[in-house]
């Protein structure tokens, strides 16, 4: 099974080891993710739609964005919008996405790159295709996972980081 490693593990937020009070959870249902549209109209499949949040914690939701082959002028993004108390982890399989936020974070992520945004105490951000993708069209496909922050970190300082595909290597587990 592939594992993801980076040169400096300190670039990623810490995930605590499960405590003794935590137990393995069984799969309670298998569903088909409904299709819909997000933001200004980009296609998504929402994997956790209709699932009780208490069963998902620490996850909030996960969207598959695309896979879509846009024509010129078709790529869509989001308007400025707020987040608070969780993190978004966005992975781009194909295409390019631009992020900008009210904390000064942001950048362009593309094939194999990951964007990790901690909303913490609150942040405004926008996600949009870059101008060249809007002008020429092209393939876009990615995933975004929302991860709930523990109560003590809900008001933490917002932050943003890009993890480039070249910084990540795959290892095979035995």
Please name every model-derived segment:
Residues 35-93, 168-174:
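A short glycine-rich, His/Asp/Glu-containing loop-to-beta-strand
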Residues 119-152:
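Ligand-binding loop in jelly-roll beta-barrel domains
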Residues 76-78, 103-106, 128-135:
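Catalytic micro-motifs at enzyme active sites that drive phosphoryl/nucleotidyl and oxygen chemistry
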Residues 2-46:
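Hydrophobic alpha-helical membrane-insertion signals
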Residues 90-111, 123-126:
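A short beta-strand-loop-beta hairpin characteristic of the jelly-roll/cupin
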Residues 61-64, 106, 132-135, 148, ...:
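NAD(P)H dinucleotide-binding glycine-rich loop of Rossmann-like/cofactor-binding domains
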Residues 141, 148-174:
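Conserved, well-structured core segments that form or line functional sites
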